[in-house]
């Protein structure tokens, strides 16, 4: 027996048995290929192409609208009355409306001082503003720190209230709802909301309140987010590109056309009477902000987006935190659509076109189709056509439409144009979780109401770096393994290899790149990695 002849140690009966199984499996696949696999894949291609066209038309429509808005200079002060609030000698400070500032927080050790300090630094008559810190922290040390910070500002004459609850029912929505029940809130006209990592500039109220004061049908003024850590890592740059498009295009288009868009949950100021008329805060989904916005819109209230007003905040820089955030942002809207679709269709307070905009454009295309088609088409169906060459995808669906959509997205962040290829691959990876979360929301699955507060690092990374010489850093490798990403990566790698040897479409160039992106995410090598000491 030769040393390299491994087949000689395997019984002939086993080899024959293995060949029989392989032949039988091949025969079964051949038998079901034509009547089952090919038609099913063709149907999948047709559905995905339809969704791609829906998304393409929506993006082109928004591109046209935003171009017209810029061309004709439809600035906010041309659509809504704006006059600076003037001093009144007779009325004194009572001429200024009473404003409530709400800051909900949960174990925000790294950023609580930033948000509280920024809120206390807002320029407004001191007797016409109330700052309400809603602390749901479960860590007693952090609660003490937050309370001490509030006391420190109170000693300086700031009207600040520190509020806690004995439970976390309703999470953020529950905290905001409880805050609105306080007796001192009854005298307030407007409420501005800032999450714990948001830092408004001192003139925030001077630039927003006049719109609400002079336009009685205006319920909400939303500011834009400005990211202080967008250059921290490649993942934060990718987030910046997506969110810049959201604010620059989606929010602006909604504000300019139907005076409706989704409230971003922070960096906005509401008319309290409108908030109450809409039914107040509800915790039935994880997107209480969007829920409130839709209900207020159905009451006939209008919204205004101020793109020129920016509020600094922090992007999630760890992959774990970003995944949790994207689950909430994808699952919540799908679940809200399930709960409110009929209510929207039967509403009599808004026009038919606004109903179409809310149901079709806002929910179906942007919150459902955009997530599903990205993953199902580009990461499942398109690769599958490599293995089943009887099914083809037209070039306009595989190349032209996604290329145009990508270029339209680039208008939000011109400085990151050179990163578009990385952005595409990253968005496809994240579409896996968004698609899963979307179906959980639509079907009200087990994690439909999962609420995990997005982790903010603040300067924790810098602090960790200074301790490297004193302590040995250990990374728990197993905590960073993500099986779903690795599974999709293996599928794409296999299809890519098959296409490289037997295919004719040269999809393997894309498939290999996308597989690598899934592997990078699957092994947790993305975003900021916080060491465990």
Curated annotation (Swiss-Prot):
Pfam families: Glyco_trans_2_3. Disruption phenotype: Plants develop approximately half the number of lateral roots without affecting significantly aerial parts development, and are resistant to A.tumefaciens transformation. Expressed in cotyledons at the base of the hypocotyls, in root elongation zone, lateral root primordia, vascular system of young leaves, abscission zone of the pedicle,. One of its GO terms (molecular function) is mannan synthase activity. InterPro entries: Glyco_trans_2-like, Nucleotide-diphossugar_trans. GO terms for biological process: cell wall organization; DNA-mediated transformation; response to bacterium. Coiled coil: none annotated. Its main location: Golgi. It comes from the Eukaryota. The keyword Cell wall biogenesis/degradation applies. Keywords: Cell wall biogenesis/degradation, Glycosyltransferase, Golgi apparatus, Membrane, Transferase, Transmembrane, Transmembrane helix. PANTHER family: GLUCOMANNAN 4-BETA-MANNOSYLTRANSFERASE 9. Possesses glucomannan synthase and mannan synthase activities in vitro. Mannan synthase consists of a 4-beta-mannosyltransferase activity on mannan using GDP-mannose. The beta-1,4-mannan product is the backbone for galactomannan synthesis by galactomannan galactosyltransferase. Galactomannan is a noncellulosic polysaccharides of plant cell wall. Required for lateral root development. This is Glucomannan 4-beta-mannosyltransferase 9. The gene is CSLA9.
